């Protein structure tokens, strides 16, 4: 699935009608310059494994490059977002705990460079994502990725 303009393509690895109750698992594909989400922190831990391509991790206002097979363990409460980098798409395996979770969207100068900062600090997703376009739509991308495979171009 993908959002027309932001967030990349998302491939849930669980059925929509019966999601796992304890964890969320998906593969997210982002293109150069595109964030996977808004800069945020959650009350649970997450893990991110780069399957292919390059991306930039913004964590606690610092930018860090990630390459294929790099892994980032994100402890609960850590502010973060991932932005596509390099010349083509980047696929990331994302795993996170899924109990009722507190999410916070702080204002971030580092993330704002990529359009990945909330306009004002909030803990309301609808408020934080108010300027992001609509729903995720089903899509299939070829694997391995072709650097020209960006469906938005």
Regions found by a protein language model. Name each.
Residues 9-13, 26-42, 76:
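Conserved short histidine dyad/triad with adjacent acidic residue
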Residues 56, 68, 76-102:
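Ligand-binding loop in jelly-roll beta-barrel domains
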Residues 21-26, 44-46, 53, 76-78, ...:
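A generic structural signal for short beta-strands and their flanking turns/coil linkers
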Residues 1-23, 110-153:
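A short, N-terminal "cap"/entry segment at the start of jelly-roll beta-barrel domains
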């Amino acid at each position: 699935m993908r959002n027309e303009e932001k967030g990349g393509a998302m491939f849930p690895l669980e059925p929509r009608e019966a999601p796992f109750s304890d964890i969320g698992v998906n593969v997210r594909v982002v293109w150069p310059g595109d964030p996977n989400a808004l800069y945020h922190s959650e009350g649970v831990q997450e893990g991110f494994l780069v399957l292919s391509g390059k991306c930039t991790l913004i964590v606690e206002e610092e930018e860090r490059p990630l390459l294929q097979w790099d892994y980032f363990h994100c402890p609960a409460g850590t502010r973060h977002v991932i932005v596509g980098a390099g010349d083509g798409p980047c696929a990331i395996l994302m795993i996170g705990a899924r109990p009722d979770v507190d999410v916070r969207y702080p204002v971030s100068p580092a993330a704002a460079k990529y359009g990945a900062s909330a306009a004002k600090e909030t803990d309301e997703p609808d408020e934080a994502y108010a300027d992001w376009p609509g729903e995720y739509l089903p899509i299939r991308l070829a694997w391995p990725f072709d650097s020209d495979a960006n469906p938005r171009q």
